[in-house]
Amino acid sequence: MNVIRFSDLCAQGQVSGKRVFIRADLNVPQDDAGHITEDTRIRASIPCIQMALDAGAAVMVTSHLGRPTEGAFKPEDSLAPVAQRLAELMGRAVPLIANWVDGVSVQPGQLVLLENCRVNPGEKKNNEALARKMAALCDIFVHDAFGTAHRAEASTYGIAQFAKVACAGPLLAAEMDAISKALANPKRPLVAIVAGSKVSTKLTILKSLASKVDQLIVGGGIANTFMLAAGLKIGKSLAEPDLLEDARAVIAAMKARGAAVPIPTDVVTAKTFAADAVATVKAATDVADDDLILDIGPQTAAALATQLKAAGTIVWNGPVGVFEFPAFENGTQTIAHAIAESSAFSIAGGGDTLAAIAKYGIEKQIGYISTGGGAFLEVLEGKTLPAFEILTRRAAG
């Protein structure tokens, strides 16, 4: 990928005294009280910010948070908790600036956080007037938000069209390098885990990966749809019956290549979706009409762990069960530890996956942890992301 790298500009002394606008991904999960529950994305954004400060730049950083209504700012849309956490992690003041589109006062060596960019009218539709105003704020635009690389919005795409210089931050560049290592030229066998509740959003990926991977492990709501497709009963579990033909097509495509989609042989069920629900391990053929499947069973988990330990490359997206509930976390925990113990190059992405990695303390044993959810998925689909398209184009002059 031929893009300008921000690290190169810094090394060449081209950043000193310049106004640098960093589009980061600080979209972190919060509890009902607004406290940040998991700060991986904030931590991941710091190297780029520090690099800009060390190079003598006047630094502006923005991000989206949640799904606010454009033009209607509400207190819960504020990046204030993010500014506070960033200040704690960096050991310096991080002023938060509202209504910043028409101008920001920031000096070299200073860092400011610009309020939630998704509140700006025209952000999502990549409004040209908004993009030009943002581009006018800076000398150098740095895209360091892989999590938004699949969206052509004003703060991720439009500004890159009009800024004097548009480049990739260290996080974005590292994502690109890791993804090409995992997918463009993988060491085999290549095993992908695609799990989570949103089957419809991941079907394209399943179809794309079915032509690339040696094993395609499905979990969560997705596995339920595949179980249905294989003729098993799933009770009242989450599934998408209208997608059965698609699931069968994926199974057939894998089979035609001598590869497989392992269907669970045992599952963990409950009668209600609750942390205190009674967990029952059952054969996959014994699911009752009023059962909810909330995890893969121990036999299935052990079989998958064996496959993962023998893999050359592992792509992991999504927990295989409701790991937030202790009674239904065994499948995800077993798979997490198998990936950690495997000698394979592993790349993992998606918010729930990051939460599982943090819960089981295996950050150091994963080859590369992607901070992008949807963007990571679109790369898996084989798409060219808008961010890479525009940064490549700008690098080519």
UniProtKB/Swiss-Prot annotation:
Pathways per UniProt: Carbohydrate degradation; glycolysis; pyruvate from D-glyceraldehyde 3-phosphate: step 2/5
Key words of the record: ATP-binding, Cytoplasm, Glycolysis, Kinase, Nucleotide-binding, Transferase
Pfam families the record matches: PGK
One GO molecular-function entry: ATP binding
Localization: Cytoplasm
Recorded catalytic activity of this chain's protein: (2R)-3-phosphoglycerate + ATP = (2R)-3-phospho-glyceroyl phosphate + ADP
Coiled coil: none
GO cellular component: cytosol
Enzyme category, top tier: transferase
Cross-referenced InterPro entries: Phosphoglycerate_kinase, Phosphoglycerate_kinase_CS, Phosphoglycerate_kinase_N, Phosphoglycerate_kinase_sf
Binding site for ATP: K202, E324, G350, G351, D352, T353
Superkingdom classification of source: Bacteria
Principal location class: cytoplasm
Binding site for substrate: D25, L26, N27, R41, H64, L65, G66, R67, R118, R151
Gene3D superfamilies referenced in this protein's UniProt entry, alphabetically: Phosphoglycerate kinase, N-terminal domain
GO biological process: gluconeogenesis; glycolytic process
UniProt xrefs under PROSITE patterns: PGLYCERATE_KINASE
EC number: 2.7.2.3
HAMAP family in UniProt: Phosphoglyc_kinase
Family assignment from sequence similarity: Belongs to the phosphoglycerate kinase family.
Description of how the protein assembles with itself and partners: Monomer.
Protein name as catalogued: Phosphoglycerate kinase
Organism: Albidiferax ferrireducens (strain ATCC BAA-621 / DSM 15236 / T118) (Rhodoferax ferrireducens)
Recorded name of the encoding gene: pgk
